[in-house]
Amino acid sequence: MTADRPALRTGDRDTRLSFGSNLSSFTDYLRGHAPELLPENRIGHRSHSTRGGDGMESGDLAPHGTTIVALTYKGGVLLAGDRRATQGNLIASRDVEKVYVTDEYSAAGIAGTAGIAIELVRLFAVELEHYEKIEGVPLTFDGKANRLASMVRGNLGAAMQGLAVVPLLVGYDLDADDESRAGRIVSYDVVGGRYEERAGYHAVGSGSLFAKSALKKIYSPDSDEETALRAAIESLYDAADDDSATGGPDLTRGIYPTAVTITQAGAVHVSEETTSELARRIVAERTEQGGSAR
């Protein structure tokens, strides 16, 4: 042993080994070294009851995101969401961003408790970037889906208090045999169960029942990107028509759904100009038809 290199103490060795074992997972590193920074640990200590101390439901205490839709099309997949967040029977926000690009070939939408969900998806994006920097290769789509499932499972304690987070993950699978069918959709339950959605479309949130009913009638797996985007916006319009927690196109304030498309070229945010034009066209057509679909 040299004089300028002191002996490694047992505690130091254990720390280094612990650090190295979870090095590729930024979430695991936070859990071991700064657990208070994880989304599920930033809500404060509350009773395990689903009611607040003043008799309010926990859903009334924090804004909730509502409806997200996803659908595959020939050569890609898209994710779209409305902009409304509710707090009990009030509109907490009219222009929440619920759709996020998480890396070059994936995106996630959020439904549930908005504050926790936004932090969770942002942490997920850091997780993917951290893994690629450490390992030198990006995670496969299945790897991404499993990582997000683990993070949702970590929020179980908050979910049992009524502060649930339900993301919707989409991505372009670079390992797919058929490039025209490489778009994939994965949904989750509040305990972290992951489910591959093979119908080609899915929706989560309070308006999901109405959105999926609309997509069932107009969805085609062979549609192009523009047709798929129109179907997504139309399904959100139908959801908003029946679900008060889902916000439809707001022509007065200029607030429209947001969307992300993912193809072999990567993930791209759809411009507001494109979504607003489609939304205005749909509203005009519905107005001519007395509010009913074509």
UniProtKB/Swiss-Prot annotation:
Subcellular location: Cytoplasm
Propiece residue ranges: 1-65
Keyword match Hydrolase: yes
Gene3D superfamilies (UniProt xref): Glutamine Phosphoribosylpyrophosphate, subunit 1, domain 1 (3.60.20.10)
Highest taxon of source: Bacteria
Pathway: Protein degradation; proteasomal Pup-dependent pathway
UniProt GO BP: modification-dependent protein catabolic process; proteasomal protein catabolic process
EC number: 3.4.25.1
Annotated catalysed reactions: Cleavage of peptide bonds with very broad specificity
Entry keyword set: Autocatalytic cleavage, Cytoplasm, Hydrolase, Protease, Proteasome, Threonine protease, Zymogen
Annotated control of activity: The formation of the proteasomal ATPase ARC-20S proteasome complex, likely via the docking of the C-termini of ARC into the intersubunit pockets in the alpha-rings, may trigger opening of the gate for substrate entry. Interconversion between the open-gate and close-gate conformations leads to a dynamic regulation of the 20S proteasome proteolysis activity.
Keyword Hydrolase: yes
Active site as annotated: T66
Major site of localization recorded for this protein: cytoplasm
PROSITE patterns hit by this protein: PROTEASOME_BETA_2
A GO molecular-function annotation: threonine-type endopeptidase activity
EC top class named in words: hydrolase
GO cellular component entries: cytoplasm; proteasome core complex, beta-subunit complex
NCBIfam families xrefs: 20S_bact_beta
Function according to Swiss-Prot or TrEMBL: Component of the proteasome core, a large protease complex with broad specificity involved in protein degradation. The R.erythropolis proteasomes are able to cleave oligopeptides after Tyr, Phe and Leu, very poorly after Arg but not after Glu. Thus, displays chymotrypsin-like activity, low trypsin-like activity but no caspase-like activity.
Quaternary assembly: The 20S proteasome core is composed of 14 alpha and 14 beta subunits that assemble into four stacked heptameric rings, resulting in a barrel-shaped structure. The two inner rings, each composed of seven catalytic beta subunits, are sandwiched by two outer rings, each composed of seven alpha subunits. All four combinations of alpha- and beta-subunits (beta2-alpha1, beta2-alpha2, beta1-alpha2 and beta1-alpha1) yield fully assembled and proteolytically active proteasomes. The catalytic chamber with the active sites is on the inside of the barrel.
PANTHER family: ATP-DEPENDENT PROTEASE SUBUNIT HSLV, METALLOPROTEASE TLDD
Recorded domain comment: In contrast to M.tuberculosis, the propeptide is required for correct proteasome folding and assembly. The propeptide is positioned strategically at the region where it can act as an assembly-promoting factor by linking its own beta-subunit to two adjacent alpha-subunits at the same time.
Family stated for the protein in its record: Belongs to the peptidase T1B family.
Annotated protein name in UniProt: Proteasome subunit beta 1
Species this chain originates from: Rhodococcus erythropolis
